[in-house]
């Protein structure tokens, strides 16, 4: 199976967690896009979705799925999203698609976070994939200096502006042994909006696409 076929398999497998009549939290990226396609088959059975990016919102609406503002939603049963890396503790690096802030907000309010990924995203130690950090534009250089002190090599993601109007620093060269501590440390730097470490709030379920089928891991 190709990587895209593995992504499609986990996207469709996540449908089993969708309850009729509910509002579903939806992530961003190529794997999440397959989940949105699958969700389109439940149009009319679900109340709608809360979306983590303008791109996902557009795709949901094109399939006829109502999209709600998170402020108008009291409860979110599940949030389904991909990952750039996921370790054995169900901690993740996310944000390759620059939607990390909205992804983290929606994940924080959902009862259950379901991570969908192909097997190439599984790692023992996080950090080979550059860690995205969303930053207020005026603080970019100041934040970069602090990230160097934490052992990273920050690189400005040229030409990218997030849906929130901010910029992204991708931090290379990290070997993340204590993801919770690093997430807290980076969150504490003035000017940081969000770091793409999902450690304090990791995944509850991981659906991993492999050549032998979809593997389910429960926290």
From Swiss-Prot:
Active site: 103 (proton acceptor)
GO cellular component, one term: cytosol
Keyword Isomerase: yes
Chain positions recorded as substrate binding sites: 28-31, 81-84, 94-97, 121
EC number: 5.3.1.6
GO biological process, alphabetically ordered: D-ribose metabolic process; pentose-phosphate shunt, non-oxidative branch
GO MF term (any one): ribose-5-phosphate isomerase activity
Annotated pathway: Carbohydrate degradation; pentose phosphate pathway; D-ribose 5-phosphate from D-ribulose 5-phosphate (non-oxidative stage): step 1/1
Stretches of the chain forming a coiled coil according to its record: none
Catalysis performed (reactions): aldehydo-D-ribose 5-phosphate = D-ribulose 5-phosphate
Principal EC category: isomerase
Pfam families the UniProt entry points to: Rib_5-P_isom_A (PF06026)
Keyword Glycoprotein included in the entry's annotation: no
Keyword terms of this UniProt record: Isomerase
Signal peptide range: none
Subunit structure: Homodimer.
Xref: HAMAP family: Rib_5P_isom_A
Family: Belongs to the ribose 5-phosphate isomerase family.
NCBIfam families: PRK00702.1, rpiA
Primary role: Catalyzes the reversible conversion of ribose-5-phosphate to ribulose 5-phosphate.
Protein name: Ribose-5-phosphate isomerase A
Organism: Klebsiella pneumoniae (strain 342)
């Amino acid at each position: 199976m190709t990587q895209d076929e593995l992504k499609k398999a986990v996207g469709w497998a996540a449908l089993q967690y969708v309850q009729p009549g509910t509002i579903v939290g939806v992530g961003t990226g190529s794997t999440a896009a397959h989940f949105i396609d699958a969700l389109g088959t439940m149009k009319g059975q679900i109340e709608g979705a809360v979306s983590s990016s303008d791109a996902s919102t557009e795709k949901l609406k094109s399939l006829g799925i109502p999209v709600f503002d998170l402020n108008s939603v009291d409860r979110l049963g599940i949030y389904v999203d991909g990952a750039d890396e996921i370790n054995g503790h169900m901690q993740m690096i996310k944000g390759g698609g620059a939607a990390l802030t909205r992804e983290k907000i929606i994940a924080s309010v959902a009862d259950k976070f379901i991570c969908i990924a192909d097997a190439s995203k599984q790692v023992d130690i996080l950090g080979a994939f550059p860690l995205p950090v969303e930053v207020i534009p005026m603080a970019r250089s100041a934040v970069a200096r602090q990230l160097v002190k934490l052992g990273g090599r920050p690189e400005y993601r040229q030409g990218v502006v997030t849906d929130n109007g901010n910029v992204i620093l991708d931090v290379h060269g990290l070997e993340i042994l204590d993801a919770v501590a690093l997430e807290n440390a980076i969150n504490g730097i003035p000017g940081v909006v969000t770091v793409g470490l999902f450690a304090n709030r990791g995944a509850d379920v991981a659906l991993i696409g492999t050549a032998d089928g979809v593997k389910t891991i429960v926290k």
